[in-house]
Each structure stands twice: as structure tokens, then as C-alpha cells.
Amino acid sequence: MATTVTCTRFTDEYQLYEDIGKGAFSVVRRCVKLCTGHEYAAKIINTKKLSARDHQKLEREARICRLLKHSNIVRLHDSISEEGFHYLVFDLVTGGELFEDIVAREYYSEADASHCIQQILEAVLHCHQMGVVHRDLKPENLLLASKCKGAAVKLADFGLAIEVQGDQQAWFGFAGTPGYLSPEVLRKEAYGKPVDIWACGVILYILLVGYPPFWDEDQHKLYQQIKAGAYDFPSPEWDTVTPEAKNLINQMLTINPAKRITAHEALKHPWVCQRSTVASMMHRQETVECLKKFNARRKLKGAILTTMLATRNFSVGRQTTAPATMSTAASGTTMGLVEQAKSLLNKKADGVKPQTNSTKNSAAATSPKGTLPPAALEPQTTVIHNPVDGIKESSDSANTTIEDEDAKAPRVPDILSSVRRGSGAPEAEGPLPCPSPAPFSPLPAPSPRISDILNSVRRGSGTPEAEGPLSAGPPPCLSPALLGPLSSPSPRISDILNSVRRGSGTPEAEGPSPVGPPPCPSPTIPGPLPTPSRKQEIIKTTEQLIEAVNNGDFEAYAKICDPGLTSFEPEALGNLVEGMDFHRFYFENLLAKNSKPIHTTILNPHVHVIGEDAACIAYIRLTQYIDGQGRPRTSQSEETRVWHRRDGKWQNVHFHCSGAPVAPLQ
């Protein structure tokens, strides 16, 4: 019987040191090659937990990375398989993310943005010349070689990259990160190299003003904006940007990929190749301020998602082998959330723009006019139940990358039963109609309390709202929003995920559901609401109240609360408080002045309906925010609220809060 020889080449040739990044099935560690003393970043993937498809993607990524040898691309130096583990040895990139470096600069101009996009385009051009399409260009994947001034920009994470022949256009699957997806991908048409140029256009837009061109709280509307090319250049921030810069953006964000500028052509654009005479040298302080908020929002979302995914060991679409290389600031596992329709759906995209009717190509675009800073800090609220199979129902969005290469319209049962392998992404994706794999940037370690709570979410099962066993088919009183996606054998993923996000529950039926209106009255029809609908209404109203608190909006808060509101809360030192004056003090002196981004998570809300006009909700509330030193913090409270409906509107008449104060005080 032959003896199997186990490869130990990595162990023999490299010495491992400290961790610089971590994912669900991988870790990135600094290493030194013994024979030369050179430092690298080793991405160590636990292959014992990978599926056959994950192995194929790992091989594809390694193969692509070997092809790419360019000064603006994180380079793969070695790929070694040992028993149970695969080692990818990349450049050790120590400069952190490009966007983080920009906000730390004392001076930043249009000419600097031109230099940044030039390096990004050089990297993209090399990829395209080598027959590679990156498919996930975004700020998290743009790193700096070192902390030295003028360090080169490095493109990282080729976990979603594909190989193409020449200018081949084909359907390679639904992949990318929501705010950076091109119209052709969203329309599920054949695509190719132009998708990378579209993403470059989005990045350039952000580099110039600090917020993205496309953004909406509703992901469906976000995709509609992108497909329509609905962006604009609002005053006053765009008034100081040169016409040449706007012209390049317009050529990059051209809806028709055949007419979109190529990387080679973009590098010859006067704003890029003649920046010293064409690009403005004026310092863009407002852009830097907006970028700070943009970065803070990305980091906060990334921290939450990273914790969720790493804790729950999701392994869906792929195991990123990306050059997570790298720096403490940009490594991490690119986790595929693809088939994971049950995981983390995000309602908000990466952006920060408030809505207006101003637009370039459509009347439905968004614009950052006037109130950008508040919009950039708009608090987010996530609701996490303990539903069937541990699905997370969320109303918030992250930078999740998505990848769905198998089919345009997966079967409902496939989607709903897909939390199986895990490799988590930022994402998504993310996420498009279905969340997926993308790289995470390492962040300060989240509070242990978060992971403890998330572990409990992972262990949880059962739908919080259910008061009895679930039936095999849809309940008799489902809303049209849920019945819609189930009315055909192959519904759109986004419809299903939207219904999950709205808290309508997980469809159980695998067969076709009857088409047509539901047997019970829709929630929009006057009269008593079905209990499940009323419970969702209570949860939604509670979210609105918490958003008003996080926004420091006393007027909105007062509209939701009864004037005689009574409460027990930590701030009152155990005393029963009646009326609004006690709360007004915090709004006027603390909440209204809070300039830090806030994210609120409502864990396992339980609603008790008391007759037709009263209800009680109990939940755990996590408030995540950035403290004065720029570090992520978390506070927790346990809350109960009593609601009474008057004149068709729910009002909070009493609440009881224990634990930490409601408002973050740092």
C-alpha cells in the first residue's frame, strides 16, 4: 500500500507571525520567507470546510492572481496546498485603505483624485489586457503599498474575478457590490470588461465629492437608479469641479457598455494625462469631511457584518482567496453570501445622499444638495429575529458583495434552504437581489457582547412571531407582498428577499402558490389588521421611534409618543417619569449635537397584541457608535414599549428601559 506524502513546503519555507486579518474560514498572517528574510502576507484557508465549488473558486482566483504582475496590483508570490490548508502568499501591503489615507491628508485636490484614478485605471488596464475582469472594484479593495507619502495604490481581492477572451460578452453570473454594479449586470445581460469601468466611474465620483452617485434606502430603487443612469452633479459641491472631470465621469457612467470609455481611452483623457494643467489644485475640504463620514459608515457596517458572518460561520457563495493581503486595514475573508438569501439583507446602500428630484438621466435620481452631512450620518436600524433556520431579517444594508453564477432565477426552495457552506462577505453585497461574497476590511475588534448576542441569535430557531407550529403552506393571511414572490416557480430573488426583510416570514411552500389577491384583507384596507400584519406594524413604528432618537429629531419623536408618556429608564435613576419635558432635555442638549454615526439593532422583538388598539413590544436594543477617539463602541438595553392606537395612528404611551442609557454618551 502506497504511503501518502504530505506536502509541508509552506511550513518548511516560511515562518508565521501575528494575525493581520480574519474571516470565517481563513486568516491572514504576516510571514517571513526563511531563505530571504522578506516579509509577506499569508492567507491561510481552511480547505476542510470548503465545498467542491469553493475549491474551484479558490483555484480560479489563484490562477488569475498568478497572471497579474503590475505595480498597482497586489501580487501573489506563492500558492501552496498542505493537508487541510491552502496558503496564498501575497505582497505585505501596510498602507491601509486609500480612502482612509485621503481623509488623513492635510491637502487633497482634484489633481490628487486624478492621480488616484490613474493608478486604478492602470491596474484595470493590465487586468483587461490579461483577459481578466475584476468585477468587484470598490474602496475596500483599493490599498496603499506603504504609509510613505506618495505610496502606490494597489488593487486587491480577485475573489470574484473572471477570465474572458478579448472583448467577449457573456453572462458570467450576478456578482459585485450593490452601489458599484453596472446596468448590464442588473439587467442580467451579457457583460465583460466595461463593468470595471462603470465601477471606476462610481469611485471617481466619490473621490471628488465624498459620496456616491447612486444611493437609496430601498435597494430596488437603488438598482432602478443605476439602470437608468440617474445621477447628477448638484450644487454647490460640484460647482468647483472642472468640466473635464465631469466629462470623464459621464463617459465612465455611460449606460450602454458598447459606448462606455475603455481603460486605455480613459488613461488618455486630458483630465488624467494632463492633470497639471487641466485638473484643479484647489483644496477640497468639504470632500474630505464627506469622505470621513462615508468611511465611518462603511466601517461600522463592516464591523457588524464581519461579526455576524464570522460568528455564524456562513459559507455560501465562495471562500475569498483575495489578496486580503495585506494590511490590517483591508484584509479579511471575502465571504460569499450568494445563495444565502437568508442572511444579511441590507436596505441601505453604501451611500449617504439625501433624495431630491434632481437627476441627469431620470427624474428619480438622488442628490446630496444642502443636507449632506446629516444624511451621511443617518442612523441605521436593523431588526434581527430568531426566525426559522436562524435567518436574519434586516432592514439595513452593508457593503456586501454578491455572486450568483449558477442561474438567473433560482428556485424558491434553493434560495430559502441555502445557509450551508460558509465564507462570508462584505456585502454585499452586496447585495443585490442576493447577498454575496466580497472582501472585508479588518476593523477594531467588536465588543465581546456583540458576539455573545450574535451567538445566541445563531443558536436560535423558530419564528419569534409564531404562536404555534408553522404549517406546510403559506398561512391564510399572507400579505400580497409575500404572496407575490411565491406566485411563480422562479420568482426574482430580490422579491423573496424583500419579503423576508419586511418580516413577512420565510415561505415554506415549494409548490406554486395561487395567483391573485390573498384571502384575507390587505393591511392597506381600513379595518382590523390581521395579527401578523399588526405585529409588523408595531415593529416598524418602534424602528421609526428609535430612528427619531438617533437622529435627535424631537419633533418626529413627539409625534410618535403620547404627550403623557410614562417611562422607567436609567437616566431617571429608577423614577417614573411622565410627560415629554424630561426627554426633550436629551434631544436638545445631547442627541441633536451628536455628530457620530449610529447603528441600532433590535434583537428578537416580541409583540403582544392586546385587542384591536393596543399592543406591547419587548426587545433587546444594541446601539453601535463611534466614540470620541474614533473607536467602535456598543451599548445594550432591554426595552418594553406599550402602544395605543388613536385616530388610526400608533402612539407610545409607556416604555421601560433597563441596562445602559439609550443615548451613547461618548
Curated annotation (Swiss-Prot):
Catalytic activity, as annotated: L-seryl-[protein] + ATP = O-phospho-L-seryl-[protein] + ADP + H(+); L-threonyl-[protein] + ATP = O-phospho-L-threonyl-[protein] + ADP + H(+)
Domain Protein kinase: residue ranges: 14-272
Region (Calmodulin-binding): 291-301
Enzyme class: transferase
Compartments, record wording: Cytoplasm, Cytoskeleton; Cytoplasm, Cytoskeleton, Microtubule organizing center, Centrosome; Sarcoplasmic reticulum membrane; Synapse
Comment on protein domains: The CAMK2 protein kinases contain a unique C-terminal subunit association domain responsible for oligomerization.
Keyword Transferase attached: yes
Name the record gives this protein: Calcium/calmodulin-dependent protein kinase type II subunit beta
GO biological process, one term: regulation of dendritic spine development
Biased composition range(s): Pro residues: 432-447, 514-531
Activity regulation, per record: Activated by Ca(2+)/calmodulin. Binding of calmodulin results in conformational change that relieves intrasteric autoinhibition and allows autophosphorylation of Thr-287 which turns the kinase in a constitutively active form and confers to the kinase a Ca(2+)-independent activity.
Residues modified as Phosphothreonine: 287, 306-307, 400-401
Binding positions (ATP): 20-28, 43
Autoinhibitory domain as annotated region, ranges: 283-292
Disordered as annotated region, ranges: 349-534
GO CC annotations on file: calcium- and calmodulin-dependent protein kinase complex; centrosome; cytoplasm; cytosol; endocytic vesicle membrane; neuron projection; nucleoplasm; postsynaptic density
Record-annotated active site: 136
Annotated Polar residues bias: 354-369
Modified residues (Phosphoserine): 367, 394, 397
Biological classification of the source: Eukaryota, Metazoa, Chordata, Craniata, Vertebrata
Assembly information from the UniProt record: CAMK2 is composed of 4 different chains: alpha (CAMK2A), beta (CAMK2B), gamma (CAMK2G), and delta (CAMK2D). The different isoforms assemble into homo- or heteromultimeric holoenzymes composed of 12 subunits with two hexameric rings stacked one on top of the other. Interacts with SYNGAP1 and CAMK2N2. Interacts with MPDZ. Interacts with FOXO3. Interacts (when in a kinase inactive state not associated with calmodulin) with ARC; leading to target ARC to inactive synapses. Interacts with CAMK2N1; this interaction requires CAMK2B activation by Ca(2+).
